[in-house]
A protein has these predicted regions:
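Proteolytic cleavage junctions
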Residues: 1-12, 27, 43-46, 61-170
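Predominantly extracellular/luminal regions of secreted and cell-surface proteins
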Residues: 14-62
Length: 170
């Protein structure tokens, strides 16, 4: 947790978030109390990665739909003491540091596209980028939900039929 007016930092599970002061409630009103933070780093190399991830790894950028290759994801939620949702005020951001394991770090690009999950649309939306600094991807975000560092790739749909001795299997 941190004080809404002064900001602060929260760390855990390799994830680090530095908050500026300036938090608002769902109506856009200034919030001045203690901000509760629920945050989880979701490691794309973990066996339970898909259990925590919303939707699938399909995103949209200006050129259309893309398949996303994740280099790290974070679920972040801010609430007041009663569980009401909070967000940074307009013009305020928080710096999120996504840890990279050795296998991911070896193939990490200096800058990677940053995506957030749009719950209304049901897919990932490109919103900025993250920079590689000291073995972590760092990004400034202006709202909280699921954030994902991803390399977008084109995808194809392959249709086929499995047969045995010329007879289709069901």
């Amino acid at each position: 947790s941190f004080d809404a007016s002064t900001g602060g930092s929260v760390s855990g599970n390799g994830l680090n978030i530095v908050f500026q002061g300036g938090i608002v409630d769902a109506s856009g009103n200034e919030y001045t109390g203690t901000v509760q933070v629920a945050a989880k780093y979701i490691d794309p190399l973990s066996a339970d990665f898909f259990d925590y991830m919303p939707g699938n790894l399909i995103g949209a950028d200006a050129s259309g739909r893309k398949y996303l290759e994740s280099y790290g994801m974070a679920a972040i939620e801010l609430t007041d003491g009663s569980g009401n949702e909070l967000q940074p005020a307009d013009g305020k951001t928080a710096e999120v540091s996504f840890p990279l394991s050795g296998a991911l770090l070896a193939g990490a690009q200096a800058t990677i596209p940053l995506w957030h999950f749009n719950e209304a649309k049901g897919y990932w939306v490109l919103e900025g980028s993250a920079s590689l600094e000291g073995g972590v991807y760092k990004a400034n975000v202006s709202h909280f939900s699921f954030w994902n560092c991803d390399i977008p790739t084109d995808y194809v749909i392959i249709n086929g039929q499995i047969t045995e001795g010329g007879t289709p299997l069901s």
